[in-house]
């Protein structure tokens, strides 16, 4: 396990609870507690409302206090609602960590838990996810 020389939450644009939840998720990823079948950067939650991506897991481990999710109505009256954070309220660097706003074919959406751990550690340490480096592993 690497020593933690993380930037302060305020430097990262995070609240204390958001920071603490991301540190907890990092530990879970590095210990292999979040498996491939439980992780995808393509969505915040799986259709069954279990956590999926870094943002979803941070929300989950903080019992909903970090990156609070709000209901997003379905596209039609027959569509189910989805849940997501207030993306517009997040700093750019946090959006980049979560892979928000990318093209559906961006490699970040295929990241493994190990690659996500590398990007998350980079974000907490340097203030940038550095996905290209993480995905090269």
Residues of each region from the PLM?
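Catalytic phosphate/metal-binding cores of nucleic-acid and nucleotide-processing enzymes, i.e., regions
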Residues: 3-135
